[in-house]
């Protein structure tokens, strides 16, 4: 039951962080490109690498907390569904280049940031 509570609490926090962080990014740089979604997914990619690598190498993070942070917080923070919808809308609007850049940069940059998170955890 503790795991479910962690998932719920951290999930709510992750959703709120996504809402405010992506909104803040859009306020700064505009909506010509899905920058807000891009930003939260990059942050989430780094954190999943960091949290998973650190928690699997250390006893400081309980399995319940790890699940709460990854499934809960990062599940609420990151969003594949919004990424998919925004990309689809770009395609529908005839913005093939922007949609392609979104897909390629999102996947590649998120993989790099996951690796950076893993590397950071190994350094700690």
From Swiss-Prot:
Binding site for Na(+): 75, 78
Gene Ontology annotations for the cellular component aspect, listed alphabetically: plasma membrane
Keyword tRNA-binding appears in the UniProt entry: no
Free-text function comment from the UniProt entry: Fluoride-specific ion channel. Important for reducing fluoride concentration in the cell, thus reducing its toxicity.
UniProt cross-references to HAMAP family, sorted A to Z: FluC (MF_00454)
Pfam families named in the record: CRCB
Name under which the protein is recorded: Fluoride-specific ion channel FluC
Domain of life (superkingdom): Bacteria
Reactions catalysed, as given in the entry: fluoride(in) = fluoride(out)
Keywords in alphabetical order: Cell inner membrane, Cell membrane, Ion channel, Ion transport, Membrane, Metal-binding, Sodium, Transmembrane, Transmembrane helix, Transport
Transmembrane region(s): 4-24, 32-52, 68-88, 96-116
Organism: Geotalea daltonii (strain DSM 22248 / JCM 15807 / FRC-32) (Geobacter daltonii)
Gene Ontology biological process: cellular detoxification of fluoride
Activity regulation info: Na(+) is not transported, but it plays an essential structural role and its presence is essential for fluoride channel function.
